[in-house]
């Protein structure tokens, strides 16, 4: 730990990383406060900040020679096989670490790698290469399985803990596995933080973008007060301000052979309303809709739009155009609606639900990986980040209010490299609720723009389903036809 006065140059360097956002750190009294220029307090400057050689410092940091926390179960023959681009990442990491050791800098590196790159297997290779006892920290238990699979493949002795940290600490008194896989809430326990700081050298923070380290979180406190000897941040969408805690970044562009297409399924809807919809419309401009909760609630009961989504999915799936489908909603009730309707059409052998409230969901996800055809309905919260079903070939985005980081993570679910190259995303920019029509159009356009400009998708027009349900979806041509019929009938009375 390094308590330093906030001199101008130090403040400017830290502030530059936050991209204009507020800068918050722990002060000498242990309070987590916003740092003001010219402050007289001393502040705890994160160890990882000095991992970048561009940051000037006279501080000297510990090296691996001061610890003896080495892996005992390592077997070089079990090292995972990597693709050439993954080997390039390993080479970059090793080269950077040699420079850091020479300059006596902290061994902290952010691996900024695209969704589908294979961050887990690449990091397991690095872990085996370092041969140091490791803690893998994930934001939620949904990500445990993919780490468990890769760690077992490398043949490392490991322990998984997702429930009580107190029981884990008791077990650690008699055994000290080479690899600990834990959920981040374990870091709220100071005794556990002290233990891993002493007995483990490498700390891997998976999905590091899910943590805002400008907030006083368990991860923030751990990195500030119990900084590990070595640290990797793993992310496809780095949060700029988090660089203060891990200031060296490796980003290798991924060249892909995938054919990625995004369709905007565009239809004209007659205005649709119910008592429930009218009630929710009144709340759109109030404080209760600050995070667009009611905007998404309106989409969940927008029957014409829901029917269009179902019709599109059913026809594409029946035709064999798509085979392994992920359907994403924002709200749980919206997820359940689609699940029940699809279940009636295709049955439980094809349709599955990714429900965060069901403890058996991780086992179900594991079982469907081997299926040739399935429809997996889930929420953005559960499946938007880290869902490990590499065979997914299509994505239906039923919600609209999604930030850029979530969009990139979500689209990454269908960008994993497999033998099959076609990937398709469907978005629905229209709504029958006229009060949110332009808002939804703008949000969906943001999804399209990011997918095309940043992720290599190609936008194509989609017109097959313009007349998918005459009772709920009205195209421009069918509407015009009805008007002409009315005129004709009135003239012939």
Swiss-Prot record:
<keyword id="KW-0347">Helicase</keyword>
<dbReference type="InterPro" id="IPR050742">
    <property type="entry name" value="Helicase_Restrict-Modif_Enz"/>
</dbReference>
<dbReference type="GO" id="GO:0044423">
    <property type="term" value="C:virion component"/>
</dbReference>
<dbReference type="GO" id="GO:0006353">
    <property type="term" value="P:DNA-templated transcription termination"/>
</dbReference>
<keyword id="KW-0806">Transcription termination</keyword>
<keyword id="KW-0804">Transcription</keyword>
<dbReference type="InterPro" id="IPR006935">
    <property type="entry name" value="Helicase/UvrB_N"/>
</dbReference>
<comment type="similarity">
    <text>Belongs to the helicase family. Poxviruses subfamily.</text>
</comment>
<keyword id="KW-0597">Phosphoprotein</keyword>
<dbReference type="GO" id="GO:0016787">
    <property type="term" value="F:hydrolase activity"/>
</dbReference>
<feature type="binding site">
    <location>
        <begin position="113"/>
        <end position="120"/>
    </location>
    <ligand>
        <name>ATP</name>
    </ligand>
</feature>
<keyword id="KW-0805">Transcription regulation</keyword>
<comment type="function">
    <text>DNA helicase which seems to act as a postreplicative transcription termination factor. Involved in ATP-dependent release of nascent RNA. Forms a stable complex with single-stranded DNA, and to a lesser extent RNA.</text>
</comment>
<dbReference type="GO" id="GO:0005524">
    <property type="term" value="F:ATP binding"/>
</dbReference>
<dbReference type="Pfam" id="PF04851">
    <property type="entry name" value="ResIII"/>
</dbReference>
<dbReference type="GO" id="GO:0004386">
    <property type="term" value="F:helicase activity"/>
</dbReference>
<keyword id="KW-0067">ATP-binding</keyword>
<dbReference type="InterPro" id="IPR027417">
    <property type="entry name" value="P-loop_NTPase"/>
</dbReference>
<keyword id="KW-0238">DNA-binding</keyword>
<comment type="subunit">
    <text>Interacts with OPG087. Might be part of a transcription complex composed at least of OPG087, OPG110, and OPG145.</text>
</comment>
<keyword id="KW-0946">Virion</keyword>
<feature type="short sequence motif" description="DESH box">
    <location>
        <begin position="206"/>
        <end position="209"/>
    </location>
</feature>
<keyword id="KW-0378">Hydrolase</keyword>
<keyword id="KW-0547">Nucleotide-binding</keyword>
<protein>
    <recommendedName>
        <fullName>Transcript termination protein OPG145</fullName>
        <ecNumber>3.6.4.-</ecNumber>
    </recommendedName>
</protein>
<keyword id="KW-0426">Late protein</keyword>
<dbReference type="InterPro" id="IPR014001">
    <property type="entry name" value="Helicase_ATP-bd"/>
</dbReference>
<feature type="domain" description="Helicase ATP-binding">
    <location>
        <begin position="100"/>
        <end position="256"/>
    </location>
</feature>
<dbReference type="GO" id="GO:0003677">
    <property type="term" value="F:DNA binding"/>
</dbReference>
